[in-house]
From Swiss-Prot:
The keyword Metal-binding does not apply. Residues 17-94 form the Cytochrome b5 heme-binding domain. One of its GO terms (cellular component) is endoplasmic reticulum membrane. SUPFAM superfamilies: Cytochrome b5-like heme/steroid binding domain. This is Acyl-CoA (8-3)-desaturase. PANTHER family: ACYL-COA (8-3)-DESATURASE (PTHR19353:SF57), FATTY ACID DESATURASE 2 (PTHR19353).
């Protein structure tokens, strides 16, 4: 359907509401004009994307689409946010238009919204501050124990190794806590979440909060959607991911890597390398290129603290060795945990599906246990986390049975597996997609 030359000009809001069809909204998904729909209201976000507090890309990923459910999922004070959005309002959907596109399951969406209302009434969106305080204290204890190990027992091999393990655990657990704060799930106000987020991710880890939010919010908005989820940006230059994209790549006769061997070289360029050889340097480029000076200042305090506490005990050379070992161990831990929920799942281009279908087809869980909860920072409840990204993690297990019932009713697969099986499935999926690429490359 060709765009109407009259309608192509963005109308000015007047006293009488302007009405639009889904076709008109869908046409505004490019670089010049971007519209989206929330609760049947049509908003022109073309200029606003650059000022969006959550980042320009995450909101742009919903241009031309209904964004009601992600809007609810990502914003705490929705009434206040909508007041600020009034200046972007240009009209609403015509009365004869459905509330969302035909690619979305109406019954599933309606029932999920009822489930969300139930979850809020049950108080499952409210944080237990004692839980998070104890969690922070356990991180500080691990961090302090690492230094005390060297101070008390000296710098021989075994104390050095124990220090590295304790410091790695502290770094990983700080990573899980900053994840909670980045999702605004610890405090009732955004201000306090942001402030403590800077402390945990910046001072305790040496990572910029703005970089994490920029990347992670996109992942949650469109998980496993190529071109929109930065977590799968390693396709196609390093890995061929997913059945559909791998076959597509093979048919195009593109070969950046020997993908049929990717399940082998994953062990070399995946878990061991991501943090020490990429994240470690890229975060500095990010904050300097985007002039995020507050983030840079927090990061510098992390390195000053480490230098002042460890160099007097170890000397500079041994300290640098310790730092690299910690980042190496952290990288392995981080990559296996963060990839086990998504890489084995469906990966495709954005098909503009409803919120529940988008999250469930791209996400799986790992069975609950005290160790799995701690080891993964409760990311073993990835399905619940993706459906309710602002829910405090200590409530995931409470909402899980309700989510399972919703999935069973609508014939949606709810995957949960043992931890080691989840790790193995990463390798199995890489092997399968690599073979699919090879078959398409050679024979299609």
């Amino acid at each position: 359907m060709a765009p109407d030359p009259v309608a192509a000009k963005t109308p000015v809001q007047g006293p009488t509401p302007r009405y639009f069809t889904w076709d008109e909204v869908a046409q505004r998904s490019g670089c010049e004009e971007r519209w989206l729909v929330i609760d049947r209201k049509v908003y022109d976000i073309s200029e606003f994307t650059r000022r969006h507090p959550g980042g320009s890309r995450v909101i742009s990923h919903y241009a031309g689409q209904d964004a009601t459910d992600p809007f609810v999922a990502f914003h705490s004070n929705k009434g206040l946010v909508k007041k600020y959005m009034n200046s972007l309002l240009i009209g609403e959907l015509s009365p004869e238009q459905p509330s969302f596109e035909p690619t979305k399951n109406k019954e599933l969406t309606d029932e999920f919204r009822e489930l969300r209302a139930t979850v809020e009434q049950m108080g499952l969106m409210k944080a237990n501050h004692v839980f998070f305080l104890l969690y922070l204290l356990h991180i500080l204890l691990l961090d302090g124990a690492a230094w005390l190990t060297l101070w008390i027992f000296g710098t021989s091999f075994l104390p050095f190794l124990l220090c590295a393990v304790l410091l790695t655990a502290a770094q990983i657990q700080a990573g899980w806590l900053q994840h909670d704060l980045g999702h605004l799930s610890v405090f009732s106000t955004s201000k306090w979440n942001h402030l403590v987020h800077h402390f945990v991710i910046g001072h305790l880890k040496g990572v910029p909060a703005s970089w994490w939010n920029h990347m992670h919010f996109q992942h949650h908005a469109k998980p496993n959607c190529f071109g929109k989820d930065p977590d799968i940006n390693m396709h196609p230059f390093f890995f061929a991911l997913g059945k559909i994209l791998s076959v597509e790549l093979g048919k195009q006769k593109k070969k950046y890597m020997p993908y049929n061997h990717q399940h082998k070289y994953f062990f070399l360029i995946g878990p061991p390398a991501l943090v020490p050889f990429f994240f470690q340097w890229y975060v500095f480029y990010f904050v300097i290129q985007r002039k995020k000076w507050v983030d840079l200042a927090w990061m510098i305090t992390f390195y000053i603290r480490l230098l002042l506490t460890y160099v007097p005990l170890l000397g500079l050379k041994a300290f640098l060795g310790l730092y690299f070992i910690v980042r190496f161990l952290e990288s392995n831990w981080f990559v296996w945990v963060t990839q086990m929920n998504h890489i084995p799942m469906h990966i495709d281009h954005d098909r503009n599906m409803d919120w529940v279908s988008t999250q469930l087809q791209a996400t799986c869980n790992v069975h609950k246990s005290a160790f799995n909860d701690w080891f993964s920072g409760h990311l073993n409840f990835q399905i619940e986390h993706h459906l309710f990204p602002m829910m405090p993690r200590h409530n995931y297990h409470k909402v899980a049975p309700l989510v399972q019932s919703l999935c069973a009713k609508h014939g949606i697969e709810y995957q949960s597996k043992p931890l080691l099986s989840a790790f193995a499935d990463i390798i199995h999926s890489l092997k399968e997609s690599g073979q699919l690429w090879l078959d398409a490359y050679l024979h299609q």
